[in-house]
Amino acid sequence: MDKLNDSSFSKLIERVDYLTKYELKYTCKKIKSRIEKLHLDEILDLRNTKYENENNIIYKILLKHKNILTKVILEFKDINNSHINKFTDKLTFINLNYCQKIDNDALIHIANTCHNLTHLELYIIPSLSDEGLKEIIMKCPKLIYLNLSGCSHFGEGSLLLLPKYLPKIEFLDLTRNYGLTDKCVEEIVKECTELKYLNLYALPKLEMNFLKNINCINLEFLDLCGNQNVTDEHFKKASDKINNIKKLNLSWCTNLTDKTIEYMFSMDKNKNLELISLHGILGITDKTIDILKNNKGILHNLNTIDLVACSNVKNRDNKYIKNIFKNVECFQVFF
């Protein structure tokens, strides 16, 4: 290992499970020194690890190393609030995706303890509600990354606090947050001007009027999949403010037409586009291809385009598309 540079050493150690990493650390002084120098002992990532008596082992790791850890990834682990209670203010990155035995008390502990938190993921935890989330929003002022995908019990009681307490948030995933209202989204996109990622996948009841007042000039990712209320007129208004989009998912937004593409991508607008999904939109025709190919930036940057079930695009054969957009390698998107 002495011959490995720091980058190679880091990649090697990151592939080792946490317990083995610590055995190495306390077996060899040189390895210990490099692990500490590169802060590799600060990361607890158990995504690809499975232990016998796992909950007990995770608890002991959190207890023993709580004053070292800055990043914990415990997604899909069967942990509970007792594990969360070992979190300290050292943590800046927490991934609790699908940890379905935690509840609002866990969020309240994080809010009261982890004031340096910048990254929080809470994918599909049905027991969570506004009671816990509002504490996170009000007490974790450094938070810029928030994944709430599949948490269906959040609503105005917490999400309306985002613009006031987290105006600099950059990443927000609200997929299947069925308590989300148009009022919430309108306030968020008007005041959270640093947003780069906004996911509103599978929220068909949103009226989409927020697009007329969007103020997120740095937005790079927007997912509106499945919304049949969004229209060309919404994008006509939004196109004045959205000019840095890289990934746009409009799958099954069936009221859209070529006009949306014209508003968003003509005259070299949004020239950094890398991915676009228009899956299932009958209002899209060959004119859309013409608009995209006349944008020189898109001609170079586009690598993914989904035209599946766009039956009014007559020339949508993969070879034909590839001949126009040389860097396209993917023709169907799965979000």
Regions found by a protein language model. Give the residues of each.
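N-terminal adaptor-interaction module of cullin-RING ubiquitin ligase components
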Residues: 1-111, 116-119, 129, 133-137, ...
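Phosphate-coordinating loops and pocket residues in cytosolic domains that bind phosphorylated ligands
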Residues: 14, 266, 294
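Inter-repeat linker/turn residues at the boundaries of leucine-rich repeats
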Residues: 29, 67, 89, 100, ...
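Conserved hydrophobic beta-strand positions in leucine-rich repeat
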Residues: 44, 72-74, 92-97, 117-123, ...
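Short, solvent-exposed loop/turn at the beta-strand->alpha-helix junction
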Residues: 50-58, 76-84, 100-108, 126-134, ...
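Eukaryotic tandem repeat interaction scaffolds
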Residues: 174-283
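Residue-level detector of alpha-helical secondary structure
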Residues: 289, 293, 322-325
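Leucine-rich solenoid repeat scaffolds
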Residues: 299-335
